[in-house]
Amino acid sequence: MGSIQFQSVREKSGTETTGGVRALDRGLQLIKCFDAGHPTWRVPDLARAVNLHRATVHRLIKTLEAESFLAFDPDAGEYRLGSALMPIAYL
């Protein structure tokens, strides 16, 4: 599996201020991790990819899951993109 590189949320928010909401920025960074090369993720791997604590990533994921932006596969223990993104993708 290839390596995926993301600028960490911590680095990104270190000196630049966009006036945005940090939690939203972090949640969107998580969603951006999912692609054809990485269609599913476990919490520890996502935490490393975005350079955030596992507890923070877990809370963000639970919020995204509650709104169907992410879905959990209990058999695999992995998250994938959820059904709420489908209508948005086809606009």
Language-model segment annotations:
Residues 2-91:
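N-terminal helix-turn-helix
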